[in-house]
């Protein structure tokens, strides 16, 4: 999967990051979108997102990745955060079992606010800290399989599987969209979710319409 031109895209996919504070969501976001990692552990406040345009086959896909940015500490994430999302990475810290123990609650909250067809990946982050592991790989994988989720272990610190995690989610979304396009006379320039539907494309951009998974 390669980088496309930021100003030219065929699809916009909103993907949300969810999970407990301190599991590494912000660093996964910055590693994927900017190839950066911050050792500063201070929690960021306020919802923010970053984008990266990638190529899936011949299609340019603009991934709009949203980060809770600390709001999960106060249980203050609103339905607006989930609105229009077609993908989600549910992240836990594999060195802190308590962050894994609440994964089911996060999944329920996600399904309460997002479309049932949303593509979800369970992500065990901080795989570089293998000596401090508290969550067995097989336990998390089994939970993912039983709940119809994708699963990967990642390290935002050393980049392990970060690209693969986002790439896999985006490909799954793209496969669903492509299947719908085959059965639809609509334009092939499609944005998913109400948040993107109202955006006006800039110079060189392809106008997008809206489709639900």
Swiss-Prot record:
It catalyses: GTP + H2O = GDP + phosphate + H(+). Expression is restricted to epithelial cells. Expressed in the gastrointestinal mucosa, (highest expression seen in the ileum and colon), kidney, and lung. A very minor and variable level of expression is seen in the splenic tissue. Regulated by guanine nucleotide exchange factors (GEFs) which promote the exchange of bound GDP for free GTP. Regulated by GTPase activating proteins (GAPs) which increase the GTP hydrolysis activity. Inhibited by GDP dissociation inhibitors (GDIs) which prevent Rab-GDP dissociation. Keywords: Cell membrane, Cell projection, Cytoplasmic vesicle, GTP-binding, Hydrolase, Lipoprotein, Magnesium, Membrane, Metal-binding, Methylation, Nucleotide-binding, Prenylation, Protein transport, Transport. GO terms for cellular component: cytoplasmic vesicle; pseudopodium; pseudopodium membrane. SUPFAM superfamilies: P-loop containing nucleoside triphosphate hydrolases. Its EC number is 3.6.5.2. Switch 1, switch 2 and the interswitch regions are characteristic of Rab GTPases and mediate the interactions with Rab downstream effectors. The switch regions undergo conformational changes upon nucleotide binding which drive interaction with specific sets of effector proteins, with most effectors only binding to GTP-bound Rab. This is Ras-related protein Rab-25. The lineage of its organism: Eukaryota, Metazoa, Chordata, Craniata, Vertebrata.
